[in-house]
Swiss-Prot record:
Record GO terms (molecular function): 6,7-dimethyl-8-ribityllumazine synthase activity
Keywords, comma-separated and alphabetical: Riboflavin biosynthesis, Transferase
Designated name of the protein: 6,7-dimethyl-8-ribityllumazine synthase
Species whose genome carries this gene: Oleidesulfovibrio alaskensis (strain ATCC BAA-1058 / DSM 17464 / G20)
Leading EC class: transferase
GO cellular component: cytosol; riboflavin synthase complex
Any GO BP: riboflavin biosynthetic process
Catalyzed reactions per annotation: (2S)-2-hydroxy-3-oxobutyl phosphate + 5-amino-6-(D-ribitylamino)uracil = 6,7-dimethyl-8-(1-D-ribityl)lumazine + phosphate + 2 H2O + H(+)
Gene3D superfamilies: Lumazine/riboflavin synthase
Residues holding 5-amino-6-(D-ribitylamino)uracil: F25, A59, F60, E61, A83, V84, I85, F116
Active site, per annotation: H91
Function (record text): Catalyzes the formation of 6,7-dimethyl-8-ribityllumazine by condensation of 5-amino-6-(D-ribitylamino)uracil with 3,4-dihydroxy-2-butanone 4-phosphate. This is the penultimate step in the biosynthesis of riboflavin.
EC number: 2.5.1.78
InterPro entries to which the protein is assigned, alphabetical: LS (IPR034964), LS/RS (IPR002180), LS/RS_sf (IPR036467)
């Protein structure tokens, strides 16, 4: 295989500023996601003083806050953390779909990386598994994705 120039992001959060959006709905799950993201960024050299936690009611409100945060120029990355758990009505589908589309749109339009840490699960047990038990911690994964993307974009 021929040699290709490869651009990769380093996992160094030193000097970067992060906005962490976290929903209050299902906060017993979301707080674990936040803890995972903050711990990860700190282990990568980031400072808690460079992280701002924004609490919102639920997932539907995340895109508008992410848009304002990205446009502010104060943050290198936005990490969106929440948990939408399926109920007996189609409400889950509307909220999950619109929040997902909205967060992706913010990243594309602003050029600021947005980490997607919005759990969309069928059960509470699945959400707990993805917030720090056997399914890993999706807050860590969202923070890692944002950090790596920031560092890659710096090289493009």
């Amino acid at each position: 295989m021929m040699h290709l120039k490869t651009i990769e992001g380093q996992f160094d959060a030193k000097g970067l500023k992060f906005a962490i959006i976290a929903t209050r709905f299902n906060d017993f799950v979301v707080d674990r996601l936040v803890g995972g993201a903050v711990d990860y960024l700190t282990r990568c050299g980031g400072s808690r003083e460079d992280m701002t936690l924004i609490r919102l009611p639920g997932a539907f409100e995340m895109p508008v806050a992410a848009k304002k945060l990205a446009a502010s120029g104060k943050y290198d990355g936005v990490i969106a953390l929440g948990a939408v758990i399926r109920g007996a009505t189609p409400h889950f589908d509307f909220v999950a779909n619109e929040a997902t589309k909205g967060l992706a749109q913010v990243a594309l339009e602003s050029g600021v990386p947005v980490g997607f840490g919005l759990l969309t699960t069928d059960t509470l047990e699945q959400a707990i598994e993805r917030a720090g038990s056997k399914g890993g911690n999706k807050g860590v994964e969202a923070a890692s994705a944002v950090l790596e993307t920031i560092r890659v974009l710096e090289q493009l």
